């Protein structure tokens, strides 16, 4: 990991230096300058979504996204402070200046790009999948055809598996009820967002279950800087760093470290951004 970070430092700073002149006229770079002067980067991260962001026994926030935040701070040469955020307040914290950067399992959506500066390329993704008992040995989505599948009322995942694969949806008012019905064998699987499923599988409460399929319907995640800095030093720095984390395999390495089921998305990005002459 350290070797990868050190290799990234030179490349990212070279990239940022190259784009600085183009944006210097219209950018104040307030957040970037504040971080560098203060010597500390404040990052908003989830603290209740294992394994991406959660608290250990000492109360420290750890996880894949916490490691990403540490890598950013290391490359900037500053200390790191992690602030726990929730889906309901993460963008507001960034808008209000309570955090400098947000890495918090946030889906990249058009409406959100009007509020915060979502960086490209997206660093991760979530999608549709199911959790099912290992004993059933489900292999493909077609295994759901004609079978009862538990879901949460109103979730769009239900419609996807019903129309695409002919599953018979058994809808419940909440996910807790749906997962209990799965335990009670009222259905062969629970359909939902794969990151939520992975969080459950990482909790230790579902050791007899698995996520058997390749996820579908990618919903990319974006880290974010303040909106006014997305095309300035900080935004371009983070864009270059996100690119490098894909290219050099850092994100795949972190995924493996935290026991997250390998995603086709990271593999595809690593290949897409890879050096075509590598190994030749």
Question: Model-found features: residue ranges?
Answer:
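Ligand-binding clefts/hinges and TM-proximal coupling segments of bilobed small-molecule sensing domains
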Residues: 25-26, 31, 157-172, 208-213, ...
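Extracytoplasmic small-molecule ligand-binding "clamshell" domains
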Residues: 25-105
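Alpha-to-beta junction loops
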Residues: 41-42, 78-79, 96-104, 148-149, ...
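Ligand-binding cleft/hinge of the Venus flytrap
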Residues: 54-57, 69-78, 141, 154-174, ...
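Short helix-initiation/N-cap motifs at beta->coil->alpha
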Residues: 66, 81-92, 136, 154-156, ...
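Extended ligand-binding regions for polar small-molecule ligands
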Residues: 67-75, 138, 142, 147-148, ...
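Acidic, polar ligand-binding/catalytic clefts
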Residues: 70, 74, 79-143, 208-210, ...
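Periplasmic-binding protein-like
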Residues: 124-132, 198, 202-242, 261-280
